[in-house]
Every structure is written in C-alpha cells, then in structure tokens.
Amino acid sequence: MECGDVQALVIDNGSSISKAGFAGDDAPRAVFPSIVGRQRYRDVMVGMGQKDSYVGDEAQSKRGILNLKYPIERGIITNWDDMEKIWHHTFYNELRVAPEEHPIHLTLSPSSSKANREKMTQIMFETFSNPAMYISIQSALSLYASGLTTGIVIDSGDGVSHTVPILEGHSINHAISRLDLAGNDLTDYLGKLLSGRGYPFISIDETEIVRDIKEKLSYITLDFQNEIKIVSSALEKSYELPDGKVISIGNELFRCPEALFQPSFLGMESAGIHETTYNSIMKCDVDIRKDLYDNVVLSGGTTMFPGIADRMNKELTALAPSTMKIKIIAPPERKYSVWIGGSMLSSLSTFQQMWISKEEYDESGPSIVHRKCF
C-alpha cells in the first residue's frame, strides 16, 4: 500500500494531554486528557448499564465517581493496557477513523527505552492492524515545526522537561538532559503557595482551578531577586472562582514558574532549565555549539509563561562565552509544536519511503523500529 494515497494520522501522547489529527493539517483535531477512569463502585454501576472504563474528557467529567489513571508518567508509557484504551479512543471516538486504513505517525519522549519503542510498534501492527507506522522523538518534531533541522529544543510539558540538541534532524543522544520538573509540579507548587495565602485548594476539582490560575496569570520575571522585594499588593491580580468569589494573588504568580530556573524551590537538587540547556550544549562537539546557541527552541505547554524567552536569553548569555550570539525561538503555537512538526513531516513526499510497512514488520518483527526510526 502506498502511504501517499491516504491521509496519515499524527498522534502525540503527552503525560497529561493527547493531541491527534491528520497529516497536513496545521493543528490537531482532537486535544483531550490522557486519562482512563474506572468505576469506584463497579458492581453497582456495571449492573446499571454503565461502562467499565472511560477515556479522556468523559473520564474527566465523571471524575467524582471514577478512579483516574494516567498511563503516561513523566513522559514514559507505564501502563500498556490503558494506553491501548487511549489509542482506541483516539481512532474510533475522537478522529472516527479505521486504524487499519491509515499510516500512523506517533511521538515518543527522548528518554523512552528500546523496549517501549518495540512495544508501541507491536501494538500498532498487531492490535490495530496499521498498514504502516513511524515513531519520532518529540523534540525533533518541534524543531521541524520551526523550520529548522539543527538547534537545541527545551521541551517542557506536564510530566517532564528535556533539553535535546539536534544536528541535521538527529538528536545527539549523549547530550540530552532530562529534568523531572514540569507543569504538574508547578501546579502543585502554586497550590501550596496559595494555601499559604489562605486559599486551600485540595480536591481534584480545585487542582483544575489552580492549573487555570497558573495558565492564565502566572509569568516569569526577568529579575527574580528584584521583583520579590516589591510589595506583593503592588503585583496583585484577581481571579474569579467558579462560585463567583474573587481572590487576589500576588507574587505567587511568578514564584511558581521561577522553580523552572530554581528547582530548589521544590526541594530538588537539579540544575534549572537554563543550566541544563547550557550543560547539553557543552556536551556537544565544539564546532556545532554556535548553531545550537543561535537556535534555542522552546516547546510544550510549560514554556508558555510570558517572560520565559527574555529570561532564558538573559541566563544563557550569562553562562555562554561572550562572543556567542544567542537566539531564543518561542513560536506562539509551541504548545502543539510537536504535533505540528509531525503533521508537516508526515505530509512531505520525501517522507513516504520512511514509513515502516506491515510487510517489513512481518518480516523483521518489532526491532525494525530501531533501524528505520532511530
């Protein structure tokens, strides 16, 4: 089967959010939570015609009566049965397609194991009977989305952050840095800061409120030490809760994302994202460092804070040699740039020979993925 004849599907499964759609589109058609919910009181519910499990938005809306599970933790698939449910839901409920009719382009975290890559390949061919598939490292796709093939990507979603140097489309594996600090950690931290202000947010519903406050009002300051000296009331912003009550929030709004640069705020000993970026560049060949400093690409929802690009520029300038030109690229659509890069790549005519076909899989088994994709 010629993959160019039928539209490929592009699926980017994140720790919290899955993005799915059709190759060649400029945005995903479906964006939904990467969750599977099961009844807490199974015997009663199933007898009343309730389903055994729910996925995505439906699971989210029924969370009061369900136990919710995230099959992807810190960017890595840890529960394959639930992951299959998410893929099934993606094909049949969200995109309404037959998976056996479309090539599938999937994405993976840079720190996923060889075994995970093989398992993903096996499920696509054996469970969903895909005619062809391909797996890309997420950060490389973000780079393509910015029209680049060489640069360093700072990719931070809800579960994990990575700094990934890429040369001519290939990630430089020994120089990748991983930081287990991302959006969910910042949401938890903001919740603690707000509790200290006398607004305790405890339940799952309230965690969603904290996430919303973070996404709508938080920002990164250029000079944290200076900003923290300003009287908090001068920085206050108001937020209306679902019940109509209005609360005021001050320096918590920039103290929360400051943890990206100072993980010690969360009790972590790791370097901040500026230092991990610098460390990744320093692990690369001296000849390509200039190209990396000149193409620092931000990717993922946790890089959406206002002020992040200026702060990153300031911090990297302080670390890098003084002769180095530093350019931070922060595309406005970077929340979805992994998916967008996958969509662009899958629709190129030159990409059509890259797919792993069902015939190749039947001949070589799951290990074909390492030869063709990585």
From Swiss-Prot:
The record's subcellular locations are:
Cytoplasm, Cytoskeleton
Q: Which SMART domains match?
A: ACTIN
Q: Which reaction does it catalyse?
A: ATP + H2O = ADP + phosphate + H(+)
Q: What is its main location?
A: cytoplasm
- What keywords were assigned to this record? ATP-binding, Cytoplasm, Cytoskeleton, Hydrolase, Nucleotide-binding
The molecular function terms in GO held by this entry are: ATP binding; hydrolase activity; myosin binding; structural constituent of cytoskeleton
Which GO terms of the cellular component aspect does the record hold?
actin cytoskeleton; cytoplasm
Which Pfam families does the annotation name? Actin (PF00022)
InterPro entries (alphabetical): Actin, Actin_CS, ATPase_NBD
* Class in the EC hierarchy, top level: hydrolase
Regarding protein family, the annotation reads: Belongs to the actin family.
Query: Which protein, by its recorded name, is this?
Result: Actin-17
